[in-house]
C-alpha cells in the first residue's frame, strides 16, 4: 500500500517589488514554547500589497524572500514540549507581534513599541499566508465555538480599532469622527459604538464604502469631494450639531489630518491611525491653542482577549467586512482584486479541506 502523500506547505512569498510567487516551503517544527498551526483564514492587508508593489514600507525593506500575511487564524496541529494551554485541534487566533526580549516597553505593557519585536510579514520576519506556520503559543488565543475562523482572522484589524479607541478615550455619550471608510475605519466605527459612543460620523471619498459603513452601523456619513479641510470640519459639526470629542484619522492623507484637527472639539483628541507621508503640513497652532491632543497609534497591544470577548458576546459584528474569498492557490488573483480597490476585506482560505468561514 502506497504511503500517504506528505502535505505541502504552499506559501505566498514576495521576492521584491512586483515579484509575488506561490512556493512550497518546508513545514516548520515548533520549538518548546511554540505551536504548529494548520492555517485556515488569512486576510489581505494594505501592508501586504505595499510590500508586493514597492518592496518596502519606510525602513522595513524586503531584502530576502518573505512570506506575507498577518491577519490570521488556524488550528493547532502540534504543540511544543512546554506548551500547556493549547492542544492539537484547538482553533486559535494569532496575534502577529511577539516580543523578543523583556525590554522597558514590555515591562510597561506597551510591547508593540519594542524595537526588536517579531512581527509577521514585516522584514525580515515571515508571515502566515501559507498552509502551515509555527508561532509563539502565548500569542495564540483559543476561539470560542461561536466565533468563526474568519472572525478570528479579523481580530487583527479589529485590534487596531480597539487600540485607537482606547488611545482616544472613547466612552459613553461621545461623538466620534472617523476619517476613512476602509477596513480600519469600519472597525474603529464598530468599536467606538461598542464603547458607548452616542454618534459616529464617517467620512470618505468613496460613496460605495460610505454606503457599507452606514450599513454596518455609522450614524452619519459624509462624502468628501473638493472641500477644504475647514469646510469638511464645518460639515461634520453641522451633521453632529457639535464638534466631536474624538477624531480617529484612518487615511494618512494630509488634508484629512488637517480636517481632523479643525473638526475636533477643544480639549478633545485626534488619534492618528493611517500612515501617510513622513513629513506632513498641519495647522499645529490650531491644535495647540485649543488643547486638541494628538496621539499616534502603532499596531496594538493587549487587545486579543478583549476582541474575542466582544465577538463571543456579539457586541460587534465584523462578518460583513468580508466581501471576497479566494483559495490560497488563487492568491495572486486575490492580490490583483485588492489592488483594483474592489470590496472591503479579502480573505484567503489556506486549508484545502475546509473553505468555510
Swiss-Prot record:
It is a peripheral membrane protein. It catalyses: xylitol + NAD(+) = D-xylulose + NADH + H(+); L-iditol + NAD(+) = keto-L-sorbose + NADH + H(+); keto-D-fructose + NADH + H(+) = D-sorbitol + NAD(+). Its cofactor is Zn(2+). Homotetramer. The modification Phosphoserine is found at residues 211, 225. Zn(2+) binds at residues 45, 70-71. It comes from Macaca fascicularis. Belongs to the zinc-containing alcohol dehydrogenase family. This is Sorbitol dehydrogenase. InterPro entries: ADH-like_C, ADH-like_N, ADH_Zn_CS, GroES-like_sf, NAD(P)-bd_dom_sf, PKS_ER, SDH-like. NAD(+) binds at residues 184, 204, 209, 273-275, 297-299. It is found in: Mitochondrion membrane; Cell projection, Cilium, Flagellum. GO terms for molecular function: D-xylulose reductase activity; L-iditol 2-dehydrogenase (NAD+) activity; zinc ion binding. Binds 1 zinc ion per subunit. Its EC number is 1.1.1.-, 1.1.1.14, 1.1.1.9. Substrate binds at residues 51, 156, 299-300. One of its GO terms (cellular component) is motile cilium. Polyol dehydrogenase that catalyzes the reversible NAD(+)-dependent oxidation of various sugar alcohols. Is active with xylitol, L-iditol and D-sorbitol (D-glucitol) as substrates, leading to the C2-oxidized products D-xylulose, L-sorbose and D-fructose, respectively. Is a key enzyme in the polyol pathway that interconverts glucose and fructose via sorbitol, which constitutes an important alternate route for glucose metabolism. May play a role in sperm motility by using sorbitol as an alternative energy source for sperm motility. PROSITE patterns: ADH_ZINC (PS00059). It is an enzyme of class 1 (oxidoreductase). SUPFAM superfamilies: GroES-like, NAD(P)-binding Rossmann-fold domains. GO terms for biological process: flagellated sperm motility; sorbitol catabolic process.
Amino acid at each position: 500500500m502506497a504511503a500517504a502523500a506528505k502535505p505541502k506547505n504552499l506559501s505566498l512569498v514576495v521576492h521584491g517589488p512586483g515579484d509575488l510567487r506561490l512556493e512550497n516551503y518546508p513545514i516548520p517544527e515548533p520549538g518548546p514554547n511554540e505551536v504548529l498551526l494548520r492555517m485556515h483564514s488569512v486576510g489581505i492587508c494594505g501592508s501586504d500589497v505595499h510590500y508586493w508593489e514597492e518592496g518596502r514600507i519606510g525602513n522595513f525593506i524586503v531584502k530576502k524572500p518573505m512570506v506575507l500575511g498577518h491577519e490570521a487564524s488556524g488550528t493547532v496541529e502540534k504543540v511544543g514540549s512546554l506548551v500547556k494551554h493549547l492542544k492539537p485541534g484547538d482553533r486559535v487566533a494569532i496575534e502577529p507581534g511577539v516580543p523578543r526580549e523583556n525590554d522597558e516597553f514590555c515591562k510597561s505593557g506597551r510591547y508593540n513599541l519594542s524595537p526588536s519585536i517579531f512581527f509577521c510579514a514585516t522584514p525580515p520576519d515571515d508571515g502566515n499566508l501559507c498552509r502551515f506556520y509555527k508561532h509563539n503559543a502565548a500569542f495564540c488565543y483559543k476561539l470560542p465555538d461561536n466565533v468563526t475562523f474568519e472572525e478570528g482572522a479579523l481580530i487583527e484589524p479589529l485590534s487596531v480599532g480597539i487600540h485607537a479607541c482606547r488611545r482616544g478615550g472613547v466612552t459613553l455619550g461621545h461623538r466620534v469622527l472617523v476619517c476613512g471608510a476602509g477596513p480600519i475605519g469600519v472597525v474603529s466605527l464598530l468599536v467606538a459604538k461598542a464603547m458607548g459612543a452616542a454618534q459616529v460620523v464617517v467620512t470618505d471619498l468613496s460613496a460605495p464604502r460610505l454606503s457599507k459603513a452606514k450599513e454596518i452601523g455609522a450614524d452619519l456619513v459624509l462624502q468628501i469631494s473638493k472641500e477644504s479641510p475647514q469646510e469638511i470640519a464645518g460639515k461634520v459639526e453641522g451633521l453632529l450639531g457639535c464638534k466631536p470629542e474624538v477624531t480617529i484619522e484612518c487615511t494618512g492623507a494630509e488634508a484629512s489630518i488637517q480636517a481632523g484637527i479643525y473638526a475636533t472639539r477643544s480639549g478633545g483628541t485626534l488619534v492618528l491611525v493611517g500612515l501617510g507621508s513622513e513629513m506632513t503640513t498641519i495647522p499645529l497652532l490650531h491644535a495647540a491653542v485649543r488643547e486638541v491632543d494628538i496621539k499616534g497609534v502603532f499596531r496594538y497591544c493587549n487587545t486579543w482577549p478583549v476582541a474575542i470577548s466582544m465577538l463571543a458576546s456579539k457586541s460587534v459584528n465584523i462578518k460583513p467586512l468580508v466581501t471576497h474569498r479566494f483559495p490560497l492557490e488563487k492568491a495572486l488573483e486575490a492580490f490583483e482584486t485588492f489592488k483594483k480597490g474592489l470590496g472591503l476585506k479579502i480573505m484567503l482560505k489556506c486549508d484545502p479541506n475546509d473553505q468555510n468561514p
